[in-house]
Every structure is written in structure tokens, then in C-alpha cells.
Amino acid sequence: MIRRVKREIRVIGFDDGTFPHKKRGEKVILVGIVMKGGSDVLGAVSRWITIDGLDVTEAIIDSILSSRFRGDLRVILLKGITYAGFNVVDVNRVFRETGLPLIVVVRKRPDFEAIENALRKHFEDWEKRMELIKAGGKIYELIPGKVYYQAIGIDAETAAKIIRATSRNSLIPEALRIAHIVASAVMRGESSKE
């Protein structure tokens, strides 16, 4: 339990690389950036995950539990709940198995109706994926129209404080911003815009 949010809180933020011209079943990189607050990068982890697969949950859990940073981490930051297309994170399982609370940060409020329609159209197991997406719980608005978040294993107020404490050069936590830069550079040869 996080009683007080310190500016130097140790977080790990995950994002995947862009994947133009790749097809379902191919691999994309998932990068986790370990930071002290919003200023110091302490390290990084990476795993390959399957486009539209169901392996991102295991990748996140494994990258944390096998990391030398494991004992220092206090929070997991996710840039959305889906990676590599519709490879959906089971946020409750990640919380149970790592013991770390999660904060899911997004720039646009999710349109669950559009997501469900896309899942129905392309996946036989659409109900399972939709259930995992909704398991993130209530969506909170941090900056009206610009930043939204979900809090798993942590209260919403503390989660908001952590987002603010770890954001420096953008509206989202620095660990997520850097994870995006690194992951997109690995996949494209150059980083892409958020």
C-alpha cells in the first residue's frame, strides 16, 4: 500500500512498438522503462509479444518478476490496456502475481462500443477480450479531454498523484513516454510520435 507519494517513487512504464505492415501472429516489442519519479531512468526491460495474441500479461509479469528492479518497484504504469493490436492485459492477474498496483493511462477516453464492435468482427474469443478490457474498472479524467486513467489495486486519488509526480515533459508519465520512444525506435528504426 502506498501511503505517501514521493517524487522519487520507483515505477515501471510499459508501451509497445508500432507495427506497420505486420500481420496477426507476428511479433512486436514491449518495453518497460524503470524510473525514479519523472526524472531518472534506472533501467529497462523488454519482451516480444504477439500481434492480436494473448501473451502480453505473461510478458509483463515475467519481465517484472525476473527483473533486478523488482524489489524497488512500487507501481506499474500501462499506456492503455491493449498492446500489439488487441493483445489485452489481464490487469487483475498482473496485480495478483506481482503484488504491484497498476495505473492505466490513456490520452483518449475509450469508446467501449467501438471496441466491442471491432472485437466481434475480428475475434472468436471477443467476449473474453472485452471482459479483460472492462476489468480495468472505472475510467477517471485527470486532465479534461486529454488524460484519463484507471487504478487497479490503488485508490484513484493516489493514482492521480503518482501520474502527476512522474510526468515531466508531457501530460503522461515519463516512463510511458520513454517506453514509447524506445519501442517505436526498435520497430521502425526511428521513434514515432505518440
UniProtKB/Swiss-Prot annotation:
<comment type="similarity">
    <text>Belongs to the UPF0215 family.</text>
</comment>
<dbReference type="Pfam" id="PF01949">
    <property type="entry name" value="DUF99"/>
</dbReference>
<protein>
    <recommendedName>
        <fullName>UPF0215 protein PF2042</fullName>
    </recommendedName>
</protein>
<dbReference type="InterPro" id="IPR002802">
    <property type="entry name" value="Endo_dU"/>
</dbReference>
